[in-house]
């Protein structure tokens, strides 16, 4: 059973782990075929000692969310919902070069659906968005 998002890292000497979110609803990946899961695989972006953890969670209305920590050792996360609408089965992706060169976080966002057990999910064509954040102003 999966419950909460966690982050794992090695400081060069030892492995550490921290819980990022506190989900209440467990889920399992048992069964055949592709599973519609209530959370997305997170996208983790690191820069200047800060960690940005981009995710989608059904418990938060399946909107685009970001958890931010200025120090992993302290493990204090601030979670912000970046959209006020559901993106359903969306998986995070961002412009990696723009982040590396300019510390700008541009997320590709599109409402998507995922059928469970290899079933198709009916959905009309959806708009594509680029959610732009300049993390230089967040420090």
Regions found by a protein language model. Give the residues of each.
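Extracellular, repeat-based ectodomains that mediate carbohydrate processing or recognition
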Residues: 1-139
């Amino acid at each position: 059973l999966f419950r909460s998002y966690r982050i794992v890292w090695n400081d060069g000497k030892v492995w550490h782990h921290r819980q990022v979110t506190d989900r209440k609803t467990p889920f399992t990946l048992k069964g055949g075929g592709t599973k519609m899961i209530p959370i997305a695989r997170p996208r983790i972006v690191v820069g200047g000692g800060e960690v940005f953890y981009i995710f989608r969670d059904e418990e938060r209305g399946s909107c685009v969310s970001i958890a931010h920590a200025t120090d992993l050792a302290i493990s204090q996360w601030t979670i912000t919902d970046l959209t006020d609408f559901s993106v359903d089965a969306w998986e995070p992706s961002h412009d990696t070069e723009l982040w590396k060169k300019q510390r700008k976080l541009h997320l590709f966002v599109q409402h998507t659906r995922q059928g469970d057990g290899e079933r198709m999910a009916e959905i009309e064509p959806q708009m594509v968005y680029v959610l732009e954040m300049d993390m230089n102003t967040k420090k």
